[in-house]
């Protein structure tokens, strides 16, 4: 099967002879809002101007929709949000996930600055940082990554998107993130910065870029960030290093870019996540003050990632373009790890036994895409075909471990109790890995966007065929499976400022390898999650509104770790179940509303987002191998976020800003016996820009969690596992940047 897929790049290339013969030489007349079609030549592909004066740079319209190509977010038949470099720089979040989760109500982060375990939730489903793509290449961000220095834009595609972006080697549901790297601007980039963050962290940054050549064809840009010191949480410190180098060439028909990215973050006391709260027979104890650490400072973790990639665009014909790339990421997450676990009462927790752990990820990613356009009578066609391959090797080594753990009582001074824990783990490592797997994913995608009635009606048909290979190198077991994921999208554009859209898409996750009684090794077909979505966008001139509704269904599956006394054991003995087999369903239904504006002569920029989410499970296997019905854990029912920026009339160059985020209550168990309480966070800030001769000085500051709210940042794991991290306390920061 994979030998056939390996020939797909040749098939893609051969498609051009037909496309060239069928092309019409005339350049079609373009209207501003009707740029949704994937245009193949350089001028049209790059013509991604903003279609609304409400766009202030934070929510740019130009997005990369994978196999569909570069399009306009306003007219896209799926829900996508794009945060550009300006937005990330203004928030000055210490991690990428903290930055992109600031405004959109259907997206919230786990980890980030509060914990070294890092990722996002889309509509109630988890996406780990290692599943982010960079420049369209999957898996290039790195495990538990937090770096932002290389990010020119971060694009959030909501909903099942396997057909659009391909399947991550480890599977993902309900969303994807693509990062576009920074490139040198025409006018050059010359910026240095200094920053301070509470409790006592210093930061230095640089951004240097220049273009060369008669038409500025060649560009080089280097970025760096160093941050070191103590966070506002006691016993939690970080040493952060981020560097990025981009070199690009943009010719008349060919554009090529090379990126090299390095990031390393060392933390002490930064992994205090409370686990398996669903097992408690009482409500979890109240969140302590944000400055309180639930883990000792000697528990240290490191994340390190190195990425090198090459990408290109070639305008092969007037009406057809080839794009592609190849990248390699080498990432590690290592240190001494413990897993604090709530006790049965919910009023105390077990500190866990810290253990030396080294997780290593090596990912090779490549793709080749062809896209173009032609017409058949009154119908326009924007076609695309893409081949993707991802290889990931994942290895985990473990070493010495604490001999015992302790029960910690939060009603008594926590630091005093943590100080009594034995920090002498030893230094011995087991030379045999505890996990050693290789996952390979080959896929071929095709799509055609048909335009009717002067492109007022648009129908996208297509899908992606994917073949997954998985090998366990410890026991030699290997298996493969494949599936075709269809894609159906539609958009109605009755007028240039109104778009009504809908879609059906799927997400895939690899199944477990199973050995039958006769010794035959197999892998079940990939697990399929299905999404239906409808939405409407309206451009009112100085503000834009989006309203959409969605449903996502994801199959459950048996953990299969028990032999008696459970629903799984009974069904296995009856021949009705095995470890990893599908059982039951979890369903998320929701409504989202988002709006952003640019008012008062572009001096007032408010944003608002609201999501209502219902997450339920039916006949769903839990972590204990029993079937449950009820709500899915740790998913807030209501999330609302509002923000504003105001360019003050009384002080030229002064901008004031603020954000309010509300997270409704969620539940720590499927039976709704015990709830995580709701909470509201408030941030305020200011930015002042002034001229120093020919240079520009920008001074920014902010207070995050202004009212020092104590709260649990909830998370969910596999099955019905519910986790929580103590939210960060009030945090101050100040930075100055000089453009010269």
Model regions and ranges:
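Acidic, small-polar-rich N-terminal luminal/periplasmic segments of exported/outer-membrane proteins
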Residues: 32-187, 534
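Transmembrane beta-barrel wall of Gram-negative outer-membrane proteins
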Residues: 189-272, 298-315
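Face-selective signature of the C-terminal outer-membrane beta-barrel domain
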Residues: 308-331, 353-474
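Membrane-embedded beta-barrel scaffold of Gram-negative outer-membrane proteins
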Residues: 311-315, 321-327, 331-337, 526-599, ...
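Structural signature of Gram-negative outer-membrane beta-barrels, strongest in the C-terminal barrel
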Residues: 361-363, 380-392, 433-555, 598, ...
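Conserved C-terminal beta-signal and adjacent last beta-strands/turns
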Residues: 382-383, 502, 530-532, 632-740
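Gram-negative outer-membrane beta-barrel transporters
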Residues: 453-456, 551-553, 579-670, 737-739
């Amino acid at each position: 099967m994979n030998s056939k897929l390996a020939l797909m790049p040749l098939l893609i290339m051969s498609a051009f002879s037909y496309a060239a013969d069928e092309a019409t030489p005339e350049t079609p007349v373009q209207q501003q809002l009707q740029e949704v079609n994937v245009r193949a030549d350089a001028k049209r592909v790059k013509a991604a101007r903003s279609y609304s004066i409400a766009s202030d740079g934070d929510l740019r319209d130009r997005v990369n929709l994978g196999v569909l190509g570069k399009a306009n977010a306003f007219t896209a038949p799926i829900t996508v949000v794009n945060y550009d470099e300006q937005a990330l720089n203004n928030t000055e979040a210490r991690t990428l996930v903290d930055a992109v989760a600031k405004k959109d109500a259907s997206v919230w982060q786990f980890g980030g600055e509060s914990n070294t375990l890092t990722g996002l939730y889309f509509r109630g489903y988890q996406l780990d940082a290692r599943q982010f793509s960079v420049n369209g290449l999957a898996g290039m961000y790195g495990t538990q990554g937090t770096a932002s220095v290389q990010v020119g834009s971060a694009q959030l595609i909501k909903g099942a998107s396997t057909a659009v972006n391909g399947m991550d080697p480890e599977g993902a549901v309900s969303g994807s993130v693509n990062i576009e790297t920074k490139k040198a601007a025409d006018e050059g980039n010359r910026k240095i910065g200094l920053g301070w963050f509470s409790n006592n962290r210093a930061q230095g940054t640089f951004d240097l870029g220049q273009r060369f050549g008669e038409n500025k064809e060649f560009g080089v840009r280097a970025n760096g960030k160093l941050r070191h010191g103590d966070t506002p949480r006691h016993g939690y410190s970080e040493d952060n290093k981020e560097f990025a180098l981009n070199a690009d060439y943009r010719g008349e028909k060919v554009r090529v870019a090379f990126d090299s990215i390095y990031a390393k973050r060392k933390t002490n006391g930064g992994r205090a996540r409370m686990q398996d709260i669903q097992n408690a027979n009482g409500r979890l104890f109240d969140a302590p003050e944000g400055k309180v650490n639930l883990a000792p400072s000697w528990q240290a973790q490191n994340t390190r990632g190195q990425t090198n990639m090459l990408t290109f665009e070639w305008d092969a014909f007037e009406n057809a373009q080839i794009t592609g790339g190849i990248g390699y990421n080498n990432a590690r997450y290592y240190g001494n790890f413990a897993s604090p676990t709530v006790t049965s009462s919910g009023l105390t927790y077990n500190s866990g036994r810290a253990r030396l752990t080294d997780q290593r990820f090596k990912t090779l990613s490549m793709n080749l895409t062809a896209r173009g356009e032609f017409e058949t009578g009154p119908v326009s066609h924007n076609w695309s075909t893409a081949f993707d391959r991802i290889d990931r090797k994942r290895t985990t080594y473990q070493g010495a471990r604490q001999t015992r753990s302790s029960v910690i009582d939060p009603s008594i001074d926590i630091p005093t109790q943590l100080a009594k824990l034995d920090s002498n783990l030893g230094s011995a490592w087991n030379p045999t890995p505890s996990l050693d797997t290789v996952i390979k994913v080959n896929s071929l995608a095709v799509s055609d966007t048909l335009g009717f009635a002067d492109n007022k009606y648009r129908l996208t048909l297509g899908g992606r065929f994917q073949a997954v290979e998985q090998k366990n190198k410890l026991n030699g077991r290997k298996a493969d499976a494949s599936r075709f994921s269809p894609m159906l999208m539609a958009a109605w554009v009755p007028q240039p400022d109104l778009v009504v859209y809908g879609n059906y898409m799927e997400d895939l996750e690899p199944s477990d390898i199973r050995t039958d009684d006769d010794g035959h090794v197999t892998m079940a077909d990939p697990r399929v999650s299905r999404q239906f979505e409808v939405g409407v966008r309206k451009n009112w001139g100085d503000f834009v509104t989006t309203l959409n509704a969605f449903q996502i269904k994801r199959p459950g599956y048996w953990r299969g770790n028990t032999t008696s006394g459970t629903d799984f054991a009974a069904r296995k003995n009856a021949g009705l179940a095995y470890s990893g087999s599908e059982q039951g369903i979890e369903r998320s239904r929701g409504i989202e509303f988002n709006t952003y504006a640019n008012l008062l002569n572009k001096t007032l920029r408010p944003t608002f987002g609201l999501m209502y989410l219902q997450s339920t499970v039916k006949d769903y296997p839990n972590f204990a191998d029993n079937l449950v019905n009820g709500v899915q854990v740790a998913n807030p029912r209501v999330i609302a976020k509002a923000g504003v920026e105001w360019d003050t009339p009384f002080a030229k160059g002064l901008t004031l800003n603020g954000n309010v985020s509300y997270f409704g209550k969620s539940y720590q168990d499927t039976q709704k016996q015990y709830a995580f309480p709701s909470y509201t966070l408030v941030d305020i800030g200011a930015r002042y820009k002034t001229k120093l001769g020919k240079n520009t000085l920008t001074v920014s500051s902010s207070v995050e969690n202004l009212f020092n709210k104590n709260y649990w940042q909830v998370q969910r794991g596999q099955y019905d596992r519910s986790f929580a991290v103590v939210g960060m306390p009030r945090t101050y920061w100040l930075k100055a940047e000089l453009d010269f």
